[in-house]
């Protein structure tokens, strides 16, 4: 999917029976986390972000997820009725300032640093899993 505007995404939600929207981000340990909202809450979430309690001191713990509209995808393993859509998000402070634990922001910063040196930064995910035999 390739959508350029919030209205494109809202039209897609309506046309494709999307019921839930997941806002995904990685914590400072690299573990993917998700916050899910009803599709009816999507316009506000795209405009204002999704607030959540972070993982810092109490007085600094409020954080905001800002969805990257270019990363929208339908989760294929979910039902076709009441579908689930996902965005990857950047993590920011409530005032819009950068959050130091935002892995996507850190990667963008490193990529810019590499380009200034005339280098290319290629990054990929490594999926690992274990298979266990059942003793039944």
Q: Residue spans of the language-model regions?
A:
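ATP/Mg2+-dependent ligation/transfer catalytic cores
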Residues: 1-136
